[in-house]
From Swiss-Prot:
Gene Ontology MF: a single term: ATP binding
Pfam family, one: Arginosuc_synth
EC number of this enzyme: 6.3.4.5
Source species of the chain: Campylobacter jejuni subsp. jejuni serotype O:6 (strain 81116 / NCTC 11828)
Name of the protein in question: Argininosuccinate synthase
Superkingdom of source: Bacteria
Chain residues that bind ATP: 11-19, 38, 121
Length: 406
């Protein structure tokens, strides 16, 4: 394939690894390279990526830096949270949900620039290679895919650094740069590697980049109100913001109060177990609030069906099938369930905890105090329960009469 590629679009961060990939593509494939850097809220200045690409010989017209923050939250994060999606009971899918948007945009740039190939920096051990490549092929099945980590022999840090030095790639470390493998966007930041590769070893406190330790969080709690329309967050404390602005604000509140830290061992799609630590402050608050709103606006069986389907939906996202017909079918069902998910949720934030202290919906609440009061009521005849119970016990009664023992 090396002699067949004419132009390749590289998912480029400006960091050491993707800068090495850029040079490697030029040398090994002898092709024109286009760089694409996505701003999905990782919190880093992106202009250095442009300068780095220029220094490595990339033409100005072949450098693409795109602000995708609002699209990321509106079209990916919010739809996922309508489903209350959690992978293996804990993981809020912060890395998984970002990959489809990057892959889609990268494929679009390939079409725009006439590139016949795309490339990414995901390793051959992880899930991201699957997520990126499923996304590419969903948009353009004719694209050639170059995954350097599956091809080259630069399989150690020493070899990578030696290659960088040989080709004049800057390897100076930024002051305060974390030694962990990290990935960040508006939804979360993740940490892998080093001491975390021993699941018995506790993460060090200085690893956490975003949030205060719950022990160091304010001694005073903070009460906030979140407004929802059709399952999506629209305002915080009455203030309407853009989708990215809303998640940014929730992150600030969560970080302040030590919310959203997670240390898990997860099952990767490729088959191995992997330990990761995550900070998802805003997402943790959002999930709790959304479920609280659904508790008063969703019909019981609709809510239970959603809960049954959620693990499948979460696995599809984790494994890279965002653009699959089955995910879209589930999304249509989920979105239908959110028509009445309108209202306000009041929460109290305190030292790592998110506590629901109120929920209301002016027009869509199914909670009716007249039916569930412990006081005398005029709408519910308690004698009706006897027949309901007897009918539901009928199979037990028949089995018992036939001598069955339970």
């Amino acid at each position: 394939m090396k002699n067949e590629v004419k132009k390749v679009v590289l998912a480029y961060s400006g960091g050491l690894d993707t800068s090495i990939i850029l040079k490697w593509l030029q040398d090994e494939y002898n092709c024109e390279v286009v760089t694409f850097t996505a701003d999905i809220g990782q919190g880093e200045e992106l202009e250095p990526a442009r300068k780095k690409a220029l220094s490595l010989g990339i033409k100005e017209e072949n450098i693409f830096i795109k602000d995708l923050r609002d699209e990321f939250v509106k079209d990916y994060v919010f739809p996922m949270f309508r489903a209350n999606a959690i992978y293996e009971g804990e993981y809020l899918l912060g890395t998984s949900i970002a990959r489809p948007l990057i892959a889609k945009t990268q494929a679009q740039i390939a079409l725009q620039t006439g590139a016949d190939a795309v490339s990414h920096g995901a390793t051959g051990k992880g899930n991201d290679q699957v997520r990126f490549e499923l996304g590419y092929l969903a948009f353009n099945p004719d694209l050639k895919i170059i995954a350097p980590w599956r091809e080259w022999d630069l399989n150690s840090r020493e070899k990578l650094l030696a290659y960088a030095q040989k080709h004049g790639i800057d390897i100076s470390k930024k002051k305060g740069k974390s030694p962990y493998s990290m990935d960040a966007n508006l939804l979360h930041i993740s940490y892998e590697g080093l001491v975390l590769e021993d699941p018995a070893h506790a993460p060090e406190e200085d690893m956490w980049r975003w949030s205060k330790s719950p022990k160091d969080a304010p001694n005073e709690s903070e009460i906030i109100e979140l407004d929802f329309q059709k399952g999506d967050l629209v305002a915080i404390n009455g203030e309407k913001l853009s989708p990215a602005g809303l998640l940014t604000k929730l992150n600030e509140l969560g970080c302040k109060h030590g919310i959203g830290r997670l240390d898990i061992v997860e099952n990767r799609y490729v088959g191995m177990k992997s330990r990761g630590c995550y900070e998802t402050p805003g997402g943790t608050i959002l999930l709790k609030a959304h479920r609280a709103l659904e508790s008063i606006t969703l019909d019981r069986e609709a809510a239970h069906l959603k809960d049954e389907l959620m693990p499948k939906y979460a696995s599809l996202i984790y494994n890279g099938y965002w653009f699959s017909p089955e995910r879209m079918m589930l999304q249509a069902l989920i979105d239908e369930s959110q028509i009445h998910a309108n209202g306000r949720v009041k929460l109290e934030l305190y030292k790592g905890n998110v506590m629901i202290i109120g929920r209301e919906s002016a027009n869509d609440s199914l909670f009716n105090a007249a039916y569930c009061t412990f006081e005398e009521d005029e709408v519910y005849n308690q004698k009706d329960a006897a027949g309901f119970i007897k009918l539901n016990a009928l199979r037990f009664i028949i089995a018992g009469k036939n001598g069955r023992k339970f």
